[in-house]
Design a protein with these regions (language model features):
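N-terminal leader/targeting and accessory segments in enzymes
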Residues: 1-92
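Phosphate-binding loop of NTP-binding sites
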Residues: 10, 90-176
Length: 176
């Protein structure tokens, strides 16, 4: 991410800053507490088996500079942003960031062949443009926002893969 601050994240999510500096820059989003470093926003997702909020202390210990959380407990100097739903907030942040960029993005979806189609389109476009594309097969509700985290102002065109596991998810991803 480029030129994103805690204040931008507050605007994107309509969240509440519980503590920390709103002018702090954010360089990356991560849902993995083991990958947190300075200027990284840890996004704890509540899954079917695990509520990743339990990893907040580990994320802070590993240098986590800022957190997005659904719970109201906040301590220390790291910014905590309270939002109703962390997955939705991550998608809102990705949409906010994507809207700051002016490049066209091609979306690829379907039942079979998304990755191959995306790779073929990107390969052809790379002959003329600096292409931004889905990393691996990160095409989910979590993966697309994490992919957009790597978008830069140097990219000229994007090719993103979008997958779904529930009704309505392609609309959500397309809106990002």
């Amino acid at each position: 991410m480029e030129n994103i601050t805690i204040q931008d994240i507050l605007e994107a999510t309509d969240g509440t800053l519980l503590c920390g500096d709103p002018s702090m820059k954010i360089d990356h989003l991560s849902t993995n507490s083991m990958e947190i470093g300075p200027n990284t926003l840890f996004v704890p997702i509540i899954g079917e088996r695990v509520d990743a909020h339990i990893f907040i202390p580990n994320a802070l210990k590993e240098g986590g500079a800022c957190l997005t959380q659904e719970h109201t407990e906040a301590s220390g100097n790291a910014p905590y942003i309270k939002v109703p739903d962390t997955l939705t907030a991550m998608q809102q942040i990705a949409a906010y960031y994507r809207n700051k960029m002016s490049l066209p993005i091609i979306g690829v979806t379907g039942s079979v062949g998304k990755t191959t189609t995306r790779e073929m389109i990107a390969h052809v476009l790379k002959g003329k443009y600096k292409v931004f594309e889905t990393i691996g097969n990160q095409n989910s509700q979590v993966g697309v926002p994490l992919t957009l985290d790597h978008l830069t102002s140097e990219d000229e065109i994007g090719v993103l893969e979008m997958g779904m596991s529930e009704k309505g998810q392609i609309t959500t991803l397309g809106n990002i």
